[in-house]
Swiss-Prot record:
MF (Gene Ontology): L-methionine:thioredoxin-disulfide S-oxidoreductase activity; peptide-methionine (S)-S-oxide reductase activity
Gene3D superfamilies linked: Peptide methionine sulphoxide reductase MsrA (3.30.1060.10)
Keywords on record: Oxidoreductase
Protein name per UniProt: Peptide methionine sulfoxide reductase MsrA
UniProt-annotated catalytic positions: 14
Any one of the GO BP annotations: protein modification process
Organism taxonomic ancestry: Bacteria, Bacillati, Bacillota, Bacilli, Bacillales
Function, in words: Has an important function as a repair enzyme for proteins that have been inactivated by oxidation. Catalyzes the reversible oxidation-reduction of methionine sulfoxide in proteins to methionine.
Organism, scientific name: Halalkalibacterium halodurans (strain ATCC BAA-125 / DSM 18197 / FERM 7344 / JCM 9153 / C-125)
UniProt xrefs under Pfam families: PMSR
Gene: msrA
InterPro entries: Met_Sox_Rdtase_MsrA_dom (IPR002569), Met_Sox_Rdtase_MsrA_sf (IPR036509)
Family of the protein in this entry: Belongs to the MsrA Met sulfoxide reductase family.
Catalytic activity: L-methionyl-[protein] + [thioredoxin]-disulfide + H2O = L-methionyl-(S)-S-oxide-[protein] + [thioredoxin]-dithiol; [thioredoxin]-disulfide + L-methionine + H2O = L-methionine (S)-S-oxide + [thioredoxin]-dithiol
Enzyme Commission number(s) from the entry: 1.8.4.11
Amino acid sequence: MEKRLERAMFAGGCFWCMVQPFDKQPGIESVVSGYAGGTVENPTYEQVKTGTTGHYEVVHITYVPELFPFEKLLSLYWPQIDPTDPDGQFHDRGPQYRTAIFYENEEQRALAERSREALEKSGKFKKPIVTSILPMATFYPAEEEHQQFYKKNPMAYKEDREKSGRDEFIYKHWGK
């Protein structure tokens, strides 16, 4: 029997930092860095980093919902980001670094909206939650050097992550 696969996309700032939390989770088949939501077909990193293409840096996740439900993806996603920042994430600034959840179907949309509302009501953040919830957009895989960056370049990844302020923020707000 063939397993049923679903897709999800999450924008959470630099895609380098968004792969590792989802990678190697049981039920997640693939995590691919790339671009979505913009106006340029087959964009390159050089184009997207200008902030003029409308694309988000995203991770595209293929998963088995019976083994790793969408709610679990959401519970991994929120603690990776600052959902109150409309202008980027941590030291990465610009529209390509905004946060968003891209849904594939109405069930995902409803779950994403409920989880955003629950986070808003939790009082965890003083500012409003600005993470967008958007319909699935065309996904363009990023160049090979951006795939699995944390594995290919562990020292550069660690240094970038430390400098970004992401881990301090996560610890302060999520205790992880």
